[in-house]
Amino acid sequence: MSMYKVVVFVPVANADEMRQVIDDAGGGRMGNYSHASFSTRGIGRFKPLGGARPTIGEVDKIEEVEEERIEFVCSEDALQGVLAAIRKAHPYEEPAIDVWQLADIPRN
């Protein structure tokens, strides 16, 4: 079964809730472990354009937000459900989500 690395960027205030949403949907599972993720903090920048309904910031003004990058692994079976759960729970109108398929590395 294929595994994926998923990365989502979320405001720091929403990071704990997002990690729980990810786990509840089946992400962050590695062998006999759950809730497996890695996080780093940084500054997200964006400019809402006309027609946007930003949760944070104003249309036509560049906004900077302290965000947390949450990365975790996800099985192919759980991937679509995890992505749907992230989109539903994410505070942003257009959440930044990256997905990579991982190489199958045999265990010795």
Where in this protein do the model-derived segments appear?
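Hydrophobic structural segments
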Residues: 1-108
